[in-house]
């Protein structure tokens, strides 16, 4: 409710301290209330429990919730030296042994955990099922078979984990692992954990896979709808009539449910434009109240800012951590070093990445500009947070093309330079990063010029210099770069074109327009302009990785699908009389055709991911943590996933979700397409395509088969997210819905693990950006 949102703003001083979460709206409340249909106790004693790793295990008689005693674990949170991966110092595991049992009768584990850890707001643990049957669990090199926990200090927590899809035909143990990440505030390096009342249970499992809607639920956008928008919701079945009630309970609209694929029934109440709070009713099912109004997405925008404030690095964030990572350094090839604390922690860990920071700043600038008149306080707060990120981007550059591009950080350092936990990351001269940051700095100039001309001048100098450095290096070899830092010809030139046009808009110098035009010609050469006559769906307008059309460009984790469309849109807006303007518009219209056709192929109006060709992939761009021998991608797995897509011809398939391996979760790829659709809508003044973009936002915010909001703290039934280093953060949008094995349908189990439930600035800023573009 907007009144509740106002109170949250006041209590957090417009999110200058973290926003409190509402556990009653979280899915956990529903899970814990489920009736238990069958159960079996798993006693914890010295005969069946083993300790692995550092620490001491003992039986505790007094501190117990069952009254029968608990297992006590005294565990270090430190280690003598950091792990080479920059992750946990050590892992302590309590294994509850089992004699190779078939546990398929049960689909949930329940236990209680208490942690004594005054200095840690969130104690990260992993609960795993160890299966040695037909399928090994946890799955080597992947993230299946393990459920992560975040346990606060000082209170018994009831933990449940439903695992109906986890292989469990020969289970040899259930483990609880505690990771040593140090403490976020100075404190003794150790915690005490109590584990009690472990049991296996059978419950009615949540819907976790497929396009069918969760039983008893209505799929709708929890944030609400703008007055002029198409307003639709879904039920799995219906008698034919639905009702829309206002806040007084009066029926203001009724309509007929329209049959859809998968047995869905669509409810369309688009004629309702009066602002207010409403509920939907169909066949005895009732939605929660939702907003129709121009301000429907404003609470979500505020919450994304709350997430970013809570993720600040090098800053005392109340309730989460004190100033941090002051001993993390970026090292220039000539040996110079500079501290890189600041900016935002990138995801569930404490990693930083320059390009994600840059995109986040860009989204904040867009929000600040979009809401200057209607929501001035929101605009000012977005501008304030953007400056925090800008400062970091400009402070961590060397002024010669090299800058801090990012580094993996998975622990709280001691903030003292010269000790064993120091992290020294190599600076890099990456043209993609420099292009993106140059464009962001250029966009910031106008927003800061009046209130702080010196800061605006700093932005201007960095924009021009970094663009020049990127130009000089854009054709250098990427062979020594990591998988996540390799870019195709399409990606590099799209980002270069955007950057050139941001500088052209900021400075008015025709050199930048000329550069943008040149880059755009390469982008047009990468676009499919003709339909393959053998395709079952007449698709064109998509892009290849390069001018030779060797492979169609697709994304599985980070996504820049919007980039070529944004480049064309900027050129068409800023140089409408240019001789290439008709060609830019044609490219926009080709992609519009592609979006319009594909938007009608999947339930809920979901945009599919892209076109894949059998036997045509490049594993060098696939990020994989740990030894590649464990869970590494293979051509056999690639082809199996491709064949599960929508068949276009003997070699090409349209996948709803990306082909993916270890890193799964696809909100980023979806929002890349949504941003592209928003750019199309702006450039072509196309309301139909704008609605396609909005539908992708609605999918994320509740109009999906699981009837959950993916933004933590927005709407209801949001799942706990993978955030090992912090409490659950309101406003986080995770990597999110994934796929199961080689299938091509949404998969969203209760299991909480990387990467799909991991909080991420890349996805959260994309939602902020989309809201700004409304």
Regions from the PLM with identified roles:
Residues 1-62, 308, 700:
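Extracellular carbohydrate-recognition regions
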Residues 3-17, 23-24, 205-207, 213-214, ...:
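Glycan-recognition and catalytic cores of secretory/periplasmic carbohydrate-active enzymes
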Residues 59-89:
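Short carbohydrate-recognition loop motifs
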Residues 154-160, 259-272:
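Aromatic sugar-binding surface patches on proteins
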Residues 182-201, 760-761:
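Extracellular carbohydrate recognition
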């Amino acid at each position: 409710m907007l009144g509740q949102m106002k109170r949250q703003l006041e209590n957090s001083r417009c999110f200058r301290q973290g926003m409190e979460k509402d556990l009653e709206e979280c899915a956990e409340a529903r899970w814990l209330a489920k009736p238990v249909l069958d159960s079996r106790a798993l006693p914890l004693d010295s005969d069946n429990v083993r300790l692995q790793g550092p620490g001491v295990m003992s039986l505790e008689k007094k501190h117990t919730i069952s009254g029968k005693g608990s297992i006590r674990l005294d565990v270090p949170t430190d280690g003598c030296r950091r792990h080479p991966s920059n992750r946990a110092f050590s892992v302590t595991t309590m294994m509850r042994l089992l004699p190779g049992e078939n546990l398929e009768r049960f689909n949930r584990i329940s236990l209680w955990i208490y942690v004594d850890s005054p200095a840690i707001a969130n104690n990260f643990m992993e609960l795993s099922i160890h299966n040695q049957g037909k399928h090994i669990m946890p799955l080597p090199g992947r993230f299946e078979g393990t459920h992560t926990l975040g346990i606060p200090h000082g209170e018994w927590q009831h933990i449940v984990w439903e695992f109906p899809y986890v292989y469990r035909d020969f289970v040899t143990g259930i483990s609880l692992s505690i990771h040593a990440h140090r403490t976020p505030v100075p404190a003794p390096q150790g915690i005490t954990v109590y584990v009690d009342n472990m049991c296996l249970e059978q419950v009615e499992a949540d819907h976790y896979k497929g396009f069918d809607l969760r039983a008893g639920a209505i799929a709708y956008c929890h944030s609400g709808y703008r007055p002029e928008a198409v307003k639709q919701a879904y039920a799995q079945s219906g008698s034919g009539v639905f009702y829309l009630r206002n806040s007084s309970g009066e029926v203001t609209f009724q309509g007929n449910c329209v049959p859809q694929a998968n047995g869905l029934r669509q409810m369309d109440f688009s004629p309702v434009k009066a602002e207010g709070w409403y509920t939907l009713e169909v066949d005895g099912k009732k939605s929660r109240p939702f907003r129709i109004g121009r301000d429907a997405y404003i609470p979500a925008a505020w919450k994304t800012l709350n997430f970013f404030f809570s993720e600040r690095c090098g800053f005392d964030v109340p309730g989460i951590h004190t100033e941090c990572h002051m001993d993390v350094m970026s090292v220039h090839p000539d040996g110079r070093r500079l501290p890189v604390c600041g900016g935002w922690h990138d995801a569930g860990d404490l990693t930083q990445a320059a390009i994600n920071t840059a995109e986040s700043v860009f989204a904040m600038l867009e929000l600040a500009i979009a809401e200057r008149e209607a929501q001035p306080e929101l605009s000012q707060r977005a501008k304030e947070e953007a400056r925090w990120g800008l400062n970091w981007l400009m402070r961590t550059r060397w002024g010669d093309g090299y800058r801090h591009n990012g580094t993996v950080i998975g622990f709280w350092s001691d903030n003292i330079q010269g000790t064993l936990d120091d992290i020294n990351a190599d600076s890099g001269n990456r043209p993609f990063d420099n292009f993106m940051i140059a464009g962001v700095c250029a966009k910031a100039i106008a927003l800061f010029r009046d209130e702080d001309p010196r800061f605006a001048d700093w932005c201007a100098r960095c924009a021009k210099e970094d663009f020049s450095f990127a130009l000089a290096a854009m054709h250098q070899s990427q062979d020594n770069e990591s998988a996540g830092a390799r870019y195709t010809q399409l990606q590099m030139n799209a980002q270069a074109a955007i950057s050139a046009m941001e500088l052209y808009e900021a400075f008015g110098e025709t050199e930048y327009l000329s550069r943008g035009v040149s880059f755009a010609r390469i982008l047009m050469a990468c676009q499919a302009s003709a339909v393959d006559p053998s395709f079952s769906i007449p698709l064109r307008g998509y892009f290849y990785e390069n001018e030779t059309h060797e492979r169609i460009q697709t994304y599985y984790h980070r996504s820049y699908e919007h980039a070529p469309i944004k480049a064309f849109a900027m050129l068409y807006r800023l140089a409408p009389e240019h001789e290439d303007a008709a060609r830019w518009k044609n490219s926009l219209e080709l992609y519009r055709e592609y979006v319009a056709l594909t938007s009608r192929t999947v339930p809920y109006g979901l945009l599919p991911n892209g076109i894949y060709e059998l036997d045509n992939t490049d594993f060098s761009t696939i990020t994989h943590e740990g030894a590649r021998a464990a869970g590494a991608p293979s051509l056999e797995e690639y082809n199996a996933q491709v064949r599960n897509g929508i068949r276009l011809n003997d070699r090409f398939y349209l996948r709803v979700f990306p082909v993916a391996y270890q890193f799964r979760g696809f909100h980023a790829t979806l929002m890349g397409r949504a941003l592209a659709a928003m750019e199309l809508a702006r450039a072509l003044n196309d309301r139909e395509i704008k609605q396609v973009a909005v539908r992708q936002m609605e999918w994320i915010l509740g109009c999906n088969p699981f009837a959950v909001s993916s933004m933590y703290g927005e709407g209801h039934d949001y799942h706990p997210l993978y955030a090992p280093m912090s409490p659950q953060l309101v406003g986080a949008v995770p990597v999110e819905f994934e796929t199961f094995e080689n299938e091509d349908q949404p998969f969203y189990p209760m299991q909480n693990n990387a990467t799909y439930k991991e909080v991420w600035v890349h996805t959260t800023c994309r939602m902020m950006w989309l809201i700004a573009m409304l």
